[in-house]
Regions:
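Catalytic-core regions of core metabolic enzymes
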Residues: 1-702
Length: 702
């Protein structure tokens, strides 16, 4: 745990640079809020034009402060903030919070000012700039002018929030308070000139007051640090939930302009989150809903959900949404159904189906307790959703108390769906330890997040490939696109099996090669300039040896007519019979280097059924994917059933596919930045025990 970050979040003394005596001004709020919310440390306002703020003496400058503050809140504009930062650093202050905007997010001049700020800080840590600050609810410390702090009190709980947007931090704080959701720490990192997401994820992973970490992300500036921090949180048993904006082109552009940073492709973020166990919130409301469920500490170990209701329509709504998401809502087993009947719920109750509808009898606290206990004790169910209907509005305390009384009986998740518009009941349930939601979809999202946490296993780290692995014989390859034969020779060196083939120049050589390979063959042009050979007539399949010579001549003429280049070299390749065609490729952007796997062949771009996994890093060097990650890629494809024996098809050689993915990733790791582009399409995955075979390939070296 960083000492500077510990002081930033729990300072014994706070200097407020540019403080105003008017609490109605932004510059007056930090001092006012510190006092309003009971900060027990020393407050040191600095303003040469003000003598006192309330009963606090105000100092003319940083040099006049009677002590070195742990933290300073800098309220000056961008033109003057760096000078205050320099003076604070000179005094030995641990960290400064710089609120001013007008830095990298505004363009070149702002970037210059941001660099000036970095130089002024030296070794002092900086939160911001362009930040709204932070709030430590655990210890009652508010270092922010956010208007959300006008509220008198906030529920304190186990959810830590890190946001790259100051406005969103205030929104989450006020929304959580209104719903009775307890938070521990909230930090707005914003421009991240120094301290960033990863620093606070790492810190919160060690924070005993935080059980769940919620992130609002615009961009990840240092993927390796982010990955390490998230894995640390996972090892500590602290789930991380992230809402990442930039899913659309417009959103991505807005995110970049807001933070002044490069953004990776959205699907790359999906891959990164999946690999480090981060739950991706699909909506902004999920960013509170999912952590609220996880903060209970209850764990979900299956997909079978009991729905207890007193209103049929709302129960059906929840059941339908759960079913769409892949959850099961089985009927009660015989013993559970009998236990429910023994409660004497009345003749109108529906106890042998799910949702279990106890009708208005469910308003009796004793009956409700009995039904909840019976369902939680049932081996048929992994979780329970309780529907709070309109009839409960008259007795919310009795209802909440009855549910709360049953929580110690089981560690299974218990959620509530509040069907009417009754936010006060939802907040009451939240305060009693029952995650309560105003939408059926929120119940589903919360359970899906809990299931993802239970299923995550950190993949084994593959060893760093030696720089020389597979490099023998590559010195002669110059920068630029290789032809197919050269590309596949490189793939083969790294352990990717390739189809048997011969390079030829003449019809006679082609016929001899075809006879040597045996059976029917494929004829292709060899060119480093023409990537999509079939588009210009440069591929012919199923050729017999006696026909290949004549076909070579016609192919040369056709390619010359279409591409303006007469091919001089050709490839005669063994036909690959059977198997499933996949594509294996390399993708690189601001987040890092990733391997892509998907449905291959000529339909690859049409179906867009792909999986991405980022290569891990160790000591600054890329590593191959671990076999577990490679297998997870294959299983995540929509077309996975085709590999797994769908409708009587022979099972594919998945272990050989996993080996090929790992080998391809080892090539990407070993060659590093020298690989500009790499793709095998198709790679044939043959029936079980027969291996895989790369039938075409592209490799561009930088």
């Amino acid at each position: 745990m960083s000492e500077a970050i510990a002081k930033l979040l729990s300072p014994r003394s706070v200097a407020v640079i540019g403080a105003s005596a008017d609490p109605g001004k932004t510059s007056g709020r930090p001092v006012a809020y510190l006092r309003k919310h009971g900060y027990a440390g020393r407050i040191l306002p600095v303003n040469p034009k003000v003598d006192r703020i309330g009963d606090l003496p105000c100092y003319p400058d940083v040099a006049s402060l009677p002590e070195v503050p742990d933290v300073a809140v800098v309220l000056l504009g961008a033109e003057r903030a760096h000078q205050a930062v320099k003076e604070l650093a000179g005094r030995g202050c641990a960290a400064a919070i710089v609120l001013a905007s007008g830095y990298t997010e505004t363009g070149e001049e702002g970037a210059r000012r941001q660099q000036q700020l970095v130089e002024a800080a030296g070794s002092m840590r900086i939160l911001g700039p362009n930040t709204i600050g932070l709030v430590n609810l655990t210890d009652g410390i508010v270092l922010s002018p956010s208007g959300a702090l006008e509220m008198d009190e906030f529920p304190v709980g186990g959810i830590g929030v890190v946001s790259q947007s100051g406005g969103i931090l205030g929104s989450l704080l006020s929304r959580a308070a209104a719903r009775g959701i307890g938070l521990s720490k909230l930090i707005a990192t914003s421009n991240e000139v120094d301290l960033e997401l990863a620093d606070f994820i790492d810190h919160l992973a060690d924070d005993p007051a935080t059980q769940v970490i919620a992130l609002y992300i615009e961009t990840v500036r240092h993927p390796a640090r982010f990955r390490a921090a998230c894995l640390k949180a996972a090892r500590a048993g602290k789930p991380v939930v992230a809402f990442k904006i930039g899913r659309s082109e417009a959103g991505a552009q807005a995110a970049v302009s807001h933070t002044g940073a490069m953004a990776g492709a959205d699907r790359m973020y999906d891959a990164l989150f999946r690999q480090v166990g981060v739950i991706r919130a699909k909506s902004f409301s999920d960013l509170l809903d999912i952590p609220a469920a996880l903060a209970t500490g209850r764990r979900l170990h299956g997909r079978r959900v009991a729905i207890l209701t007193s209103t049929g329509g709302a129960g059906t709504l929840v059941s339908d949404d759960l079913g769409v998401a892949g959850f099961e809502t089985p009927a009660p087993d015989a013993a559970t159904a009998q236990a429910l009947r023994d409660l004497q719920t009345g003749s109108e109750a529906v106890l042998d189906r799910n949702p279990i509808d106890v009708t208005l009898a469910g308003l009796r606290p004793d009956l409700l307790r009995g039904a909840i206990r019976a369902l939680l004790a049932s081996p048929t169910y992994d979780a329970l959703v309780i529907i709070v209907g309109s009839s409960s509005l008259a007795m919310p305390e009795l209802l909440a108390g009855a549910i709360q009384d049953c929580l110690p009986d089981s560690g299974k998740p218990v959620l509530a769906y509040v069907s009417p518009h009754a936010p006060e009941i939802g907040a009451l349930l939240m305060r009693r330890g029952v995650p309560a939601f105003a939408a059926a979809e929120s119940c589903t999202a919360a359970l899906a997040g809990m299931l993802q946490v239970a299923a995550f296993e950190e993949p084994a780290q593959a060893a760093v490939a030696p720089a020389s692995t597979g490099m023998a014989g590559m010195d002669h390859l110059s920068a630029g696109a290789l032809d197919e034969a050269e590309a596949k020779a490189v793939f083969s060196r790294f352990g990717v099996p390739c189809a048997s083939e011969r390079v030829v120049r003449t019809a006679a050589e082609a016929e001899a090669a075809a006879r040597e390979l045996g059976g029917r063959v494929v004829l292709k042009i060899l060119s480093s300039h023409i990537t999509h050979k079939s588009d210009v007539g440069g591929v012919a399949v199923g050729l017999a040896p006696e026909a290949i010579g004549e076909r070579l001549g016609r192919m040369a003429d056709e390619v010359e007519a279409r591409a303006g280049e007469r091919p001089q070299r050709f490839l005669v390749q063994q036909m690959v019979a059977g198997g499933t065609e996949l594509i294996l490729g390399l993708h690189r952007d601001a987040l890092g280097t990733a391997v892509l796997l998907g449905m291959g062949g000529v339909t690859a771009e049409l179906f867009q059924d792909t999986a991405l996994r980022l290569l891990p890093e160790q000591d600054g060097r890329l590593c191959p994917l671990a076999p577990g990650d490679a297998l997870d890629m294959a299983r995540s494809l929509k077309t996975w059933p085709l590999l797994d024996g769908f409708r009587g098809r022979p099972r594919a050689d998945v272990p050989a596919l996993v080996d090929a993915i790992v080998a391809f990733s080892a090539m990407a790791a070993a060659l590093g930045a020298r690989v500009a582009e790499a793709e095998i399409n198709p790679v044939f995955v043959l029936p079980e025990g027969q291996g895989v075979c790369a039938a075409d390939g592209v490799l561009v070296l930088g």
